[in-house]
Amino acid sequence: MGMEIFDYEDIQLIPNKCVINSRSEADTTVELGGRRFKIPVVPANMATVINDEIAKWLATNDYFYIMHRFAPETRRAFIETMHAAQLYASISVGVKSSEYDFIDDLATNQIVPEYITIDIAHGHADSVIAMIKHIKDVLPDSFVIAGNVATPAAVRDLENAGADATKVGVGPGKACITKVKTGFGTGGWQLAAVRWCAKAARKPIIADGGVRTNGDIAKSIRFGATMVMIGSMLAGHQESPGNILKIDGKTYKQYYGSASETQKGEHKNVEGKQMLVPYRGRLVDTLNEMQEDLQSSISYAGGRDLKAITKCDYVVVKNSIYNGD
């Protein structure tokens, strides 16, 4: 393949001369599908990360969100509720025949979500290409995000089919065991995969999975992501779905992968696991901290907005950024 292989922990970005007086001057906003959002972060469309209330709060506060698809019968009402509140609607769909019926029902009733994410584990598939074409045919005004993929060929195929953005990452997530169960994926080289795919992309890329620190958001931007999808770091909040558990005086919340037994309710083709994540307090505090850290990243990059990060030099420090800890 002749490409550099690295992941988040292998990279350090190199600072440039600072041109702003305070990090609060740094602009972290990003545009996607004709809307501008506060930060280039989207909570994972997983049942332990997002629900109706969180989606509504995010949209009201200028954050991007993608609603999960694990209560499919509620999606039409969700879109109508969001539109009634004069908010944008952003939903997920799969590729089964019932999903075609759902899309056709929306089209017939002129219920048009602003964003539709076609979300399956192996997104470089004829089934995904067919669904992109169908949505673009009957709901041409919806912005279509398709995934998940791991290669430039996949990005090109989905973009050529009509996708407006692609989601990159197969199995690097904390609650994902695709890498262990199948031997396939971007676990351990997710950031290099983002870079590889971004070089081929003509449209935005969403880096999905493997982000463990706020600095990883800046690294994703550096290597070509427009938006970064975050699961485990945005789970475990006061508002998050899932039960609060106390163990040995510590507080946790449940977190599970989208193809886990807990999610599916059956032990078949399981590629996700259930785990506990530390209780993290209020979601707004975490999102504010992400924004502040990204503002600091911009100031280190020597610029005023996210574009500055894309021009930074970097070094590859094979697994050693934590060596001093």
From Swiss-Prot:
State the superkingdom. Answer: Bacteria
Q: Which InterPro entries match?
A: Aldolase_TIM, GMP_reductase, GuaC_type_2, IMP_DH/GMP_Rdtase_CS, IMP_DH_GMPRt
Swiss-Prot/TrEMBL keywords:
NADP, Oxidoreductase
Report the EC number(s), separated by commas if there are several.
Answer: 1.7.1.7
Q: Which residues form the active site?
A: C176 (thioimidate intermediate)
Q: Name one GO molecular function term.
A: GMP reductase activity
Database matches in SUPFAM superfamilies: Inosine monophosphate dehydrogenase (IMPDH)
Which reactions are catalysed by this chain?
A: IMP + NH4(+) + NADP(+) = GMP + NADPH + 2 H(+)
Q: Which Gene Ontology terms of cellular component type are present?
A: cytosol; GMP reductase complex
Residues binding NADP(+) are 205-228
**One Pfam family from the UniProt entry?**
IMPDH
Annotated GO biological processes are: purine nucleotide metabolic process
Extent of the signal sequence: none
Q: What does this protein do?
A: Catalyzes the irreversible NADPH-dependent deamination of GMP to IMP. It functions in the conversion of nucleobase, nucleoside and nucleotide derivatives of G to A nucleotides, and in maintaining the intracellular balance of A and G nucleotides.
Q: Which family does it belong to?
A: Belongs to the IMPDH/GMPR family. GuaC type 2 subfamily.
Listed name of the protein: GMP reductase
